Amino acid sequence: PVEVTIRGRIEFRHVWFAYENDDYILKDISFVIEPGEKVAFVGATGAGKSSILNLIGRYYDIQKGEILIDGVNIKDIDTDVLRSAIGQVQQDVFIFTGDIKSNISLGNENISMEEIKRAAQIVHADSFIEKMPGGYDAPVTERGSTLSAGQRQLLSFARTLAYQPSILVLDEATANIDTETESLITSALARLMEGRTTIMVAHRLSTIQHADKIIVMHHGQIKESGSHQELLAKNGLYKKLYDLQLVES
């Protein structure tokens, strides 16, 4: 495998993908994401959005086409190197039994206490950690039941940041947050994304309007792409999805 320092340029070239012997979930997908760009994938459930996220970390191999990271075929990059460059933030945050600091560093001894604290400060997690008895040494239990959903989310942002990834993958990262924490989370997310290639999947279109580019998926194909305003002006599928959500909310 090629030794690379990953900057975060991602390219899909005519990618076809299916799980096992199923029908194709992705059909002839091509796009380019430049380093530092924020790109969101939208579309109905089953459109293939989450599959794209799985393929970037090479959790599955594709049947046809190529996926390139910084111009190198993903198959030629050491999987550990590739995955350590990708920070994944998921909707269900797993909290381990231990203390706050080990939940940020995940026990990695290369991450110093100073780095743990800096990561927490950048994403505003320090605001609640420092109020806890024991602070960074405060004990937490497996389900993190002592923490609110918002606090768990901020902790997961700090965990992601401590590993200094060059690519961020956000799968519905702001789905289950109360309004009070939402502004804190939004601002923490913005700081987490700074200078990083970011790929987001979200069902709530309000969370992705500021993306540099939005790619609209439909039945495994790319139907349209552009900025929020460009897509509204096209009056196509994105506009339909957007109008539907306005009605629902």
Named regions from a protein language model:
Residues 3-249:
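ABC-type nucleotide-binding domain
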